[in-house]
Amino acid sequence: MVAARGCTVIAHRGGAGEAPENTWTAVEHVAELGLTWMETDLRVSADGLVILSHDPDLMRTAADPRGIGELTWKELSELDAGDGRPPVRLDDALVAFPRLRFNIDLKESAVVQDALQVVRAADALERVRFASFSARRLAVLRRQEPRATTSLGVGDVLALVLHAEAGLRLPGTRWSWTKGRVDAVQVPACWGRVPVVTERFVAQAHRDGLEVHVWTVDEPEEMRRLAAMRVDGIVTDVPALALEVLGGQEPR
């Protein structure tokens, strides 16, 4: 593994700017680059199979308007996910790439239990990080599997921003990253016109034992700027370019 100045390159949807997103080609691309982490999204089929897909339907990737949750795996397996092959099942990806780590966005509540079952069956809890914009979804996951590693929930991200930038602690806020296995805060560099990732934010996150991962960063100058701020990870659609810009990747 080559060095990247301590900044991990995380392939967003498997590097959606360099391979068809969330496909076997994308997963293979991540592995061929020698990356440690792939970011992906999960949906569940009508018969409970966990599928790599950002969207709830297949219109954008397979020109099929049907929802993933409406289709059985048999029906899904007959479709082209964008690279001439069927959609990727999480269980198959975990088995086929035993050294690859997956940063998983739980796109719907229905997928939580099924995803946990798949990850447990593959004995892969140590190489999966769960994320979600839904605080409730993360809470359910943590209750069902206390050993699961997650990123910080949205409410706690706000609490961290206020604490870092203004020294404020929200009344009644539970600092969930001090309980359980929360290892990273994953945020955009800015929310609208408001900067999120600042030197104070990065420093506070590090004091709290959290890595800082920034999404979705595709411009070389922005990659360099964030790396200079000592962020720990850059989530990008162009991982090959990011490796070139940052000089490789540090093993994690």
Positions of predicted regions on the chain:
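Phosphate-group recognition and catalysis centered on beta-loop-alpha active-site segments
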Residues: M1-R252
